[in-house]
């Protein structure tokens, strides 16, 4: 018998938010707004970095990578969610579900790697400013971006195969708005310990290590800033980190909450679990362009000039 000659449903049924099905129609309105803001805001930042010479610097190249990742995550999830909420079209084929699962986890891990690269950018800019231009060359920036994507692909490539090896015969109903590895594996009528162990390994070895090194970079940044004599210089240096810190919090705080509920929240209502997952995936792509537009005057100026030229 072949490795993948096991029972799989032809399609899954997505419940959306279990227990809140009657609210799906009015929830679709805010979700449409979030989708538009995520796509529009991040596309504007991508275009601003592309056309504005003053933004051709490492910090903004990393920001454009973050915006690309946010657009990709939004496009991988929100159309399915809106189709479920607006049209009550809940079915998704087994293979499409696998692809969506891979893309969600891939771009989430890629975003974590980009946030780590951005923390390194802030570390070099503040702790070793004289070498900033020589350390973060265009080649190094491109290599860091490709490295984040390659790490995500290599680490997550086994996930679809780990699901395909499992016989799924309990149900074809996914109590979620989209397809994720933990929810799919729980439908299996076989031992899922390998999937659970690999999922925990991925969580700790990538997201956990990224967060550790981001924290370490800010410890070193804070130590360097505190050694600066001038209070004005300290505030100026720390102000350059505010946008990145907010982006890190917007990404990791919901992720830690979701991961904790996934593994330890057996008595947490299902709708709370799904709502937290939606916040984790939908909110950062909406907040990131707003954070950087509000806190970074160079971005605001570039966007203003870009729209001014379009108007003319």
UniProtKB/Swiss-Prot annotation:
Keyword Membrane included in the entry's annotation: yes
TM segment ranges: 26-46, 55-75, 100-120, 140-160, 197-217, 238-258, 274-294
Positions of disulphide bridges: 97-189
Glycan attachment residues as annotated in the record: 5
Gene Ontology terms: cellular component: membrane; plasma membrane
Pfam families per the UniProt record, alphabetical: 7tm_4 (PF13853)
Keyword field: Cell membrane, Disulfide bond, G-protein coupled receptor, Glycoprotein, Membrane, Olfaction, Receptor, Sensory transduction, Transducer, Transmembrane, Transmembrane helix
InterPro entries for this protein: GPCR_Rhodpsn, GPCR_Rhodpsn_7TM, Olfact_rcpt, OR51/52/56-like
SUPFAM superfamilies xrefs: Family A G protein-coupled receptor-like
PROSITE patterns xrefs: G_PROTEIN_RECEP_F1_1, G_PROTEIN_RECEP_F1_2
Coiled-coil ranges from the UniProt annotation: none
Ranges in the topological domain labelled Cytoplasmic: 47-54, 121-139, 218-237, 295-312
Subcellular location: Cell membrane
Record GO biological process: sensory perception of smell
Extracellular topological segments: 1-25, 76-99, 161-196, 259-273
Record flagged with keyword 4Fe-4S: no
Sample GO molecular function, one term: G protein-coupled receptor activity
Lipid bilayer topology: Multi-pass membrane protein
Cleavable signal peptide: none
Family per similarity comment: Belongs to the G-protein coupled receptor 1 family.
Role: Odorant receptor.
The name this protein goes by in its record: Olfactory receptor 51I2
Organism this protein belongs to: Homo sapiens
